[in-house]
């Protein structure tokens, strides 16, 4: 594989910065739900951030196709360092963390995700040969989910501490020969800032050779965005595939960022250890998908494999809405991780094979716009007081399951059109 060293450094920078990001995105929803008991407020913050990201994600897509992806990684790392470092410094000096600053930290990280992951995939496509796309996407999943396993385990320790001589992790009590005090939010934010710094130090050393000529559009932003729209409308089968196959990921983001802490607190009546442990199980399932999904589905059409995985995800959400069991929730998290990651690997590989690298950023922005709009609708509904009352969050899980199963209708309809699809180029 060419550009191997560049890919290793790219994955290293991604892994380091994602580690503390994962802990931050565990800590903030739990803080709103179980520490300050403001789950409805967090729902509104998340909904607002989601709506604002409509404009940001579209703009980010044009940036990814206009400027060197390496430079974008470096500048986003510096921005994360500055923002999270400043918030952490305020918390350290004042020994308090206002809710407004906690919300700001969440929005900064959330907006960072909106450019980090599309840029990561576009850069990986730029570095890899066409025949290596599936392998590289699997590597991204393995690296990302290995990091999630680690950040989930560390997050369980930092969020709850080890004052009982150990930590409850993945349903087991792990004894430790030392005590770790529960971390304050500003300390977690400072850890996050330090990993942004480490990533910013690694990125300049990435040296690579483009695997294909990258034609950069120098037109104004709206003209570049319109070209992405024209490409997808000229390839409607590809457009429908990209939208329908996003269903599991849409629901997953709503679940992880909003419903998960509510479900654990109100339905399972459990604490931060179960919250973080469920993330570890999810990451383990995703890691298994990264390792094995290509071999399991190599003789299967991409759309058919995704349909099977989506059916599994939809059934899982319906099942967990009616079963009150921590053990079953761990099984749910494990299998959902496998389904989501498997779908993402197959989906992204198919899109890499059919969308030119010089337009992938804008195409992904359009797909992500649909993602944002659907999440906004779901979050607007789930932030109603009804879903945070007692254990009514189970109804939200049932709705999520039905949303995924409904997305199967367009997926099944376009399956015949995806075989041997010829891409229509646009000027």
Each language-model region and where it sits:
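Juxtamembrane intracellular "pre-TM" segments in multi-pass secondary transporters
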Residues: 1-7, 208-243
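Substrate-agnostic recognition of the 12-TM MFS/MFS-like secondary transporter fold
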Residues: 9-25, 46-64, 68-80, 100-162, ...
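Transmembrane alpha-helix termini and helix-breaking/packing motifs in multi-pass membrane transporters
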Residues: 29-34, 88, 92-93, 150-189, ...
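Cytoplasmic membrane-interface "Motif A"-like loop-to-helix N-cap segments
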Residues: 66-80, 297-310, 392
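Helix-loop junctions on the cytosolic side of multi-pass membrane transporters
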Residues: 122, 126, 181-185, 189-219, ...
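A single, central transmembrane helix in multi-pass transporters
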Residues: 166-175, 184-185, 230-290
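C-terminal transmembrane helical hairpin of 12-TM major facilitator-type secondary transporters
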Residues: 303-343
